[in-house]
Each structure stands twice: as C-alpha cells, then as structure tokens.
Amino acid sequence: MQNIVDSIYQEMRSRTDRGKVANYIPQLACVDPNQFALTVVTQEGEVFSAGCAQTLFSIQSISKVFTLTMALGKLGDALWAQVGREPSGDPFNSIVQLEHEGGIPRNPFINAGAIAVADAIMGHNEPKETLAEILHFVRFVANDDSISIDEKVAQSEMMTGSRNASLAHFMASFERLENPVDKVLGTYFHHCSISMTTEQLARAGMFLVSNGTNHCTGMRVVPEHRARRINSLMLMCGHYDGSGEFAYRVGLPGKSGVGGGILAIAPGKASIAVWSPGLDKIGNSKLGTEALEMLVQETGWSIFGH
C-alpha cells in the first residue's frame, strides 16, 4: 500500500493543472496551491501517508460529516423534518432551491443544510458550548486531543459570509431555525474552521469504515445502520453538484471541503484523506479527486466493483 500511495503522490507532484484555491475566504486564498497530502488508514489501523500529511489545513465542509453524525445521535430520524436527503444539483450556496422548498434544505451537506444541522445540535445552548461539544466529538473520533479551530479562518468566514447569512435568514423567515441567526452562523463558521492533517482526518473517518465502530480504538461511535446511511449521503451529496461525477470517477462515499480536502470511505477497507488546495470549477479539490481516482484503480476499492 505504501508503494501505491507514494506513486500517486509522485504523479500528483508532476501535474501542472492544479485548479485554483478558494479566493472568497481571505485566509484560504493565501494557501500554497502546490501542497499535497494523502493518507490511507486501513481497517486494521495501518497508516500509509505521502506528502504534507502532517500539515494542518481547514477542513471546511468536511466538518459537516461530523455535525450530521452528532445531530443524528441527538435527534435521530426527527432530524429529517428539518433537512432533506436528496442531491441538490445546484451550487452549495444556492438560495433558489431553498425558496422553492419552503426553507427546508435539500440535504445536510449543502450550506443551508449544514446551517440547519448546526441549529439542531445547538438545542438552546450558546455557540461556545456547542462548539466545545463538536470539537470534543471530532477529537474523540480522531483519537487526538490536539485538534482545534483556527480562529483566523473563522473570523475570515464571518466577514465574507453574506451568502450564508442570507441562507440562514431565509430559513428563519420560514421558521425553520430554533436559535437566533447570528448564533447559528457563529457555530457554523467555527466548525467549518476546524484544522486537521490528512492523518488526523483519515483516522476521524474510521468509524464509517467498520459499520460505526472505530477498530483502532475499539469504540462504537454510531449504530451500524447509521454508519451505512451517512455513507450513502456522502456518496449522493458529498460533492455538491459534482457528486455524480465523483461517484462515476471514484465510486466511494466522500465529502469535500473548499479548503481542498476530501474524506473518502472505502467500507470494510480504509478511510482516506487527501488534501490539495486547488479546486475545480465546482469547488472540489482537483488533484484530490484525481488522486482518489488513481487509488481506486490500483486497489479495486470502488463500491461498484473492480
């Protein structure tokens, strides 16, 4: 496996079209686009890495996998009264669909859906308490207490997050939010600003590899049926309106973030994290997707067969 990971890294290093870093969040715009990291953690707990696997990056929307997991733990199926389970087909920050569907977001991975999930997790707690809870959970699944929120990225997002504020106010106008908009947004922007390495992120995804149990720690995180359903949502909705393309090319449940990261799950096989800051036109990591495409070709890990 290390040879496969190393060969993918060397191939990605040689590619010149690396996409473009997200420029609408100032703190992300200054990230070096030439960085690349890939980590594979197998079901048995073996770790294979190449590139900048110890470099922290902003996980952004990948955090929505963890907040969704938490919300389902708190609310169970009642969550689905607040957010749908269908692919959107629209950009991740689109307001059009939200208007047509009465303020109920299409799925928990688009921005409006993740804002609704953040509201659900809050209950009636303050953002500070909720964020401590989210951070505790991410540290738990990664088995790493050093994971933290990058406050500079969070502030950068809050200063440039007008579209997300519009989404939240729009949902509030339909009485879809329980908490004040500013508090929900503060929670949302901060959990998107969690920083992790690919090694930490791949470890954090391990519970989705083994039917809800992290074999590295022996801890059950979610029931078996819930792990399966989270994976199904990642497959259908994890790459916004590029989810079909990702399923076609890679064939794994995955969740991307505009920081250039992707968490991909090969059920029964491995948790994979890749980071390359340059994005394609939809907003997913360009080389990250290409690297995962190479990985499944080499391993036969696509859920659709060899």
Swiss-Prot record:
Residues where substrate binds: 61, 111, 157, 164, 188, 240, 258
Question: Can you state which reaction this protein catalyses?
Answer: L-glutamine + H2O = L-glutamate + NH4(+)
What GO biological process term is on the record, naming one?
A: glutamate biosynthetic process
Q: Which Gene3D superfamilies match?
A: DD-peptidase/beta-lactamase superfamily
Enzyme Commission number(s) from the entry: 3.5.1.2
Which GO molecular function entries does the Swiss-Prot or TrEMBL record give? glutaminase activity
Q: Which InterPro entries match?
A: Beta-lactam/transpept-like, Glutaminase
Supply the alphabetized keyword list: Hydrolase
Mark the transmembrane ranges: none
Please, which domain of life does this record's source organism belong to?
Answer: Bacteria
User: According to its UniProt record, what is one Pfam family this protein matches?
Assistant: Glutaminase
Q: Which NCBIfam families match?
A: Gln_ase, PRK00971.1-2
**Of which family is this protein a member?**
Belongs to the glutaminase family.
- Please describe the quaternary structure of this protein: Homotetramer.
Q: Which HAMAP family match?
A: Glutaminase
Q: What is this protein called?
A: Glutaminase
Species the sequence originates in: Pseudoalteromonas atlantica (strain T6c / ATCC BAA-1087)
